[in-house]
Amino acid sequence: MNKHKLFLSILLVGLLFSCSTEKKSELVQRLEAIFYSDSFAKIPDAVFNVADYGAVADGKTLTTEAIQKTIDAAADAGGGKVIFPAGTYLSGALFVKSNVELNIGEGVVIQAVQDNNEYPRLWTRIAGIEMKWPAALINVYDESNVRITGKGVIDGNGKYWWDKFWGDPKYTGGMWGEYKDKGIRWAVDYDCERVRPVVIWESEDVLLKDFTVKRAGFWTVSLTYSTRVHVDGVIVRNNIGGHGPSSDGIDTDSSKDILVENCDIDCNDDNLCIKAGKDADGLRVNRPAENIVYRNCITRSGHGLITLGSETSGGMRNIEVYGLKAIGTNIGIRFKSAKVRGGLIENIYFHDIEMKDVANPFHFELNWYPEYSYCTIPDNIPEEEIKDRWRVLSQRVEPEEKGIPEFRNITLSDIKVENAERAFYANAYPEKPIHDIHWKNVSVEAKESGKLTYASNWTMENVLLKSGTGKPVELKNCENIEQPEIVKTEKPQPEEKRELTLDEQIGSINKNADVVIIPVNPTANQALANGDTTEFSENIQVYVLKNEDAALSYYEPLGDGFYYIPVEVAVTNNGRTIEIKGQKEHRYTFSVNKGKKPENIEGADSWKYDDDRQQITIDKKGKSFILQLN
């Protein structure tokens, strides 16, 4: 290349870089200046091979001690790179020290041993609450200048912890089943003590680059109370051999100056997430998540392309999210919190985002999952069985107003959504609506327009909603909300059928001579047959038509909006025993055809017999119970 061409090439590159830089925000430029510097997390050249310290890559021999000796030797020498010959290394908790690079090269697998005794209990934060908990597989604890790199794999080996949590298949047992029966579903995530693959805690100047994490027992990559962390090119694959509960992808928790980019996430909860503590304990700590950029990532299975919350207590500010692509994630941009979380979430900017086949592209629920979010210790649990962490979890927020989260000053621009179910959803509080939300250059294709409750001051500039209904977004207790431009889709709609009345539905089901039980959801105007799915209702009516044995199951939402759980209804003992097995409390009314008035009904809250109709009416409030007709 001659000098003229070389000069021109340099000039073009400089111009391109200059244009690119001008378009970037001040926050992005500042973080790039930190993380793209050659001096960031610079490690000495010395190399330390784990094989020299006795590590065996056979996937059977526990190698924790040998790998840790290698890391410690590197740290004692002033720093260096720890390397692995190809193979699978079975390990417990490892602690990477300052000035050390853990290089997990291609062909290397570090696999978590399925034994909680191999993970020492440390002070940490779990799902927004500070407590002692098992260490992660790979830990950076109170360190600085650390790298974890390479094309290898960190295998959380999580199936053991998934089954411990909710059984196999899911929702068939485990601690989840035991705890929900006791009325403490909210405690199981903490007490199950599922080991995380990677935790960065109270550390600074950390690089996580290019490795794959799979089968996480709990949250996959957790960055807590840390500063200047760069996550680049990390792949997460948690839906291998099952579906790990709460297997978030990359979580930034009360940390600052964070850049997450070029990642590819497939998990079974929030794909990319930002958190800041939970409830009274999170408000006590009061550490925000701030100065954070998530960009140029792909998300696949999961429950949130990018989620803010539900742990919002310490607040969040100065966050930019862009260049993301969601492929099949069931929620896109997601806010979640609760009336005991508190926190101010402000100055957030989402832009240049694509979503395809995402059911709920914009889902802002600030009264999220009540069965999990509002922790109350039942009176029937003996005092000696109550754990200290339960007391922390159930501590009241005072004054109560402090627990109301506030989301404000949020901008969403240059976003394209294809094939969604519901375009917009928001639900906040009258005391603090979701307010000052600004939309610009947004295009959404959805079957339904959506609904906003307690929102104010939303502006929409060049926002197009192609809606299957052609209806505006429903507004309830809202002020100063601009509607998008709405175009009804031209796709042919199925011929609208008249909705059957409940009596007609019951009559249709009752034509089947074998039918014994008909549950009815009055809220959804729905008579239920075996296998049906319904929405939640406080009240459920159950008709028992004959004195015969029968059983059926239907499904209702668990509470987070995306998992559905069975409700089992059974009649046995020739109609004398009625059993309900469920996980959510309802007020049940049973109408039981009976030719003779029973002497008593064990388990009922109240009951009466109609001689003319030869029918018993039974009232019972509960989740799982048995009624015995004597």
PLM-predicted stretches and their roles:
Residues 493-495, 499-595:
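Catalytic core of carbohydrate-active enzymes
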Residues 15, 20-498:
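Extracellular/periplasmic carbohydrate-active domains that bind, remodel
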Residues 1-5:
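Positively charged n-region of N-terminal signal peptides that target proteins for export
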Residues 116, 600-620:
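Solvent-exposed beta-strand/loop surfaces of large extracellular or lumenal domains
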Residues 148, 590-605:
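Solvent-exposed beta-hairpin/edge-strand motifs
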Residues 6-15:
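Sec-dependent N-terminal signal peptides
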Residues 619-630:
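Surface-exposed interaction regions enriched in Ser/Thr/Asp/Glu
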Residues 359-361, 421-423, 539, 587-589, ...:
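Exposed beta-strand and adjacent loop surfaces of beta-rich binding modules
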